[in-house]
Amino acid sequence: MEMKNVKGTKDYLPEEQVLRNKIKRACEDTFERYGCKSLETPTLNMYELMSYKYGGGDEILKEIYTLRDQGKRELALRYDLTIPFAKVVAMNPNIRLPFKRYEIGKVFRDGPIKQGRFREFIQCDVDIVGVESVMAEAELMSMAFELFRTLNLEVTIQYNNRKLLNGILESINIPTERTSDVILSLDKIEKIGIDGVRKDVLERGISEEMADTICNTVLSCLKLSIDDFKDAFNTPLVAEGVNELQQLQQYLIALGINENAIFNPFLARGLTMYTGTVYEIFLKDGSITSSIGSGGRYDNIIGAFRGDNMNYPTVGISFGLDVIYTALSQKETISSTADIFIIPIGTELQCLQIAQQLRSTTSLKVELELTGRKLKRALNYANKENIPYVLIIGEEELSTETAMLRNMKEGSEVKVPLSSLSNYL
């Protein structure tokens, strides 16, 4: 049998997991600093849930992994963490609002594969339910900037409002049933340009006259500020979208993050579930062209799941761990899983005890040479594993209750007392 992974999946070896775990911890620490609570949901879901009309829309339906259990039930692997979160809130009406949750977990999409994007990947999500104010969006955007500062990545956030976009399309008489098609085309404008948008809407069955109107409208809007849209498109939906964008902009200025937050009137976020603010996060240096995070407001899903069709104001943000890992691995040296490596020279029993003592009395990550390698080979292993310190303990060192501490980066050695070893690290 040929040993190979399923296309779009990957094994991450221990040296890769060091960096991936660092990203996870940075996410967890940042999310919890903002008062978010951890939640875990099943990977396996009912197909009816994952294909619900208020979820990802037709584009996502094509990418859902489906299966059937022995009871002939139609099931699906989750394609995001948002729909399972909405399900949890709908099933638990006693959850105290506002509820701020985070979840880090695997999701699956049978879609195209490219740099930093696979078919099995990890999302790191935060969602807030129970807050109508765009202050929630501002806090999530601020949290995103803080997370990427922690990871030493410079980012920009593009943002828009679906009410504004829908209002513009309404004002140029795009039929309601064609709005989703046009939005999906507009969402690609930065990748395919205005000519590409025209071609795309034509392929979706839009008439040439309507396609020309769409493209002319896009060109006329590109230089407009947020405030200008009220005068350019005098509709209630545009006015509502502009008001929310103006409020959001005020919060971004107050938080000192407006400079790296860019208004993009045709950012759409293709998913049909969004009802207000939408945003996407990009690396400033452009080393990865796809977004490394995204999200927005979706006020209708929970009410639809509960069957009461009430408005449950909800906004979320999602970070792609795999694409962040790809970005960091291009610029960061992989560190070690251990702080110190103990090499016994005829002192295995005592070194076993010393390693255990260090683990229980300090925060050091300690690895012990277990295979009986000679000193040179053991040092070579520590060097390849990027372990910063090595502790060499032989009979002579034991007799004086000392050890030889080697700094692997500098190549220097010093004899240190075992009783105060942590002071030298």
UniProtKB/Swiss-Prot annotation:
* Database matches in PROSITE patterns: AA_TRNA_LIGASE_II
The record's note on quaternary structure and interaction partners says: Homodimer.
Q: Which UniProt keywords apply?
A: Aminoacyl-tRNA synthetase, ATP-binding, Cytoplasm, Ligase, Nucleotide-binding, Protein biosynthesis
Single GO cellular component annotation?
cytoplasm
Query: What GO biological process terms does the UniProt entry carry, in alphabetical order?
Result: histidyl-tRNA aminoacylation
Establish whether keyword Glycoprotein is in the entry: no
Please verify whether the record's keywords include Ribonucleoprotein: no
HAMAP family referenced in this protein's UniProt entry, alphabetically: His_tRNA_synth
EC number(s) per entry: 6.1.1.21
What superkingdom heads the lineage?
Answer: Bacteria
Q: Where in the cell is it found?
A: Cytoplasm
Q: CDD domains this protein is in? A: HisRS-like_core
> GO MF terms on file?
ATP binding; catalytic activity, acting on a protein; histidine-tRNA ligase activity; transferase activity
Record protein name field: Histidine--tRNA ligase 1
EC main group: ligase
| A Pfam family hit | tRNA-synt_His
**Matching NCBIfam families, A to Z?**
hisS, PRK12420.1
The family note in this entry says: Belongs to the class-II aminoacyl-tRNA synthetase family.
